[in-house]
Amino acid sequence: MRRRYNSAMPADAIPLSRIRRVLVTKLRHHGDVLLASPVFTALKAAAPQVQIDGLVYADTAEMLSGHPDLSELHVIDRSWKRLGLMGQGKAEWSLLKTLQSRQYDLIIHLTEHPRGAWLSRLLKPRYAVAPRVSGRGRFWKGSFSHFVPSIMGSGRRHVVEQNLDALRRLGVQPAHDKRALTFVPGADAEAHIAVRLQALGLEPGKFVHLHPPSRWHFKCWTAEGWAEIIARIRAAGWPVLLTAAPGDKEGHLIERIQTALAQRSEPPAASLAGALSLKELGALTAQARLFAGVDSAPMHIAAAMRTPVVVLFGPSGEGHWGPWGTPRLGTHQVIAQSAQFNCRPCGLDGCGGGKVSECLTSIRPDQVWAAIQPLLKD
């Protein structure tokens, strides 16, 4: 029987009813992986019979694990490189055999990573979709059945929508109510955080969660600015809880904030810096009145948990990376200096590549407080 033409769909739209298993790959950082979660939700809603697997780096697996529309989650461990040629080869071979056993009908490759082309050729799905990448040769172009076109001014289109464009290219229009981020902390993380909050004397919904650092210094605001904000939040009657990722890269800013508080004769802020897993961070921020921070994975986790977000943006673009979704109360608030700095968003690692972004460090505490204060009112 000839397929009926539908002008509202691509001419080469895939027949969803024939798809049984799908592999979605997102080989990027933590926040990038979380921003791919709506692909699973929207695809499952459009094709309930489909089993959807994910392939991510092992250190980002917590961003997707527990997703209700995820069948199996496969990982690539970047530490395999330290196993030597034989050890890495054995690990890669084991992963390949596992993926081959799943017999995928469709691969959705959401990045420009060259591994996607190899996987498409080795796994031999009926269909495979990837971004159209300028300058890629025959190997890339011959590895996929469908390509997502690049768009002018893509920095103004949110990453979530860009991920969903892979579905649109295949003829699947994502339902508006299926585009939310999904992050599942899990019962263990929630129980752990309940104990932690009780030990700190903090009640659910009665504290402000601040995550000032980013792994990238050029995305960070000043320690003095954060100390001023902490003082104002406290003066309004709200306790503050600081978090940061393990390690000195983020922990150093927390130390500087505590020092700045001491210089203001303020007591140190309660802190769980370096003490939480990503799942626990999600369970924590879900209990906060609001989250304040910078462009980082914890910001995206807070948005996924529907916690109101106040976020400071510098060289990265809020149209591309801003908080996604609808919070429990109020609205997400983005603070950016676009009028004063018409060079932003530039995407550089600081002005002139110097690791300090003036469009970010020039943000005044008054601007941040003006965004936070309304969200603290009952």
PLM feature spans:
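Catalytic machinery of carbohydrate-active enzymes
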Residues: 1-378
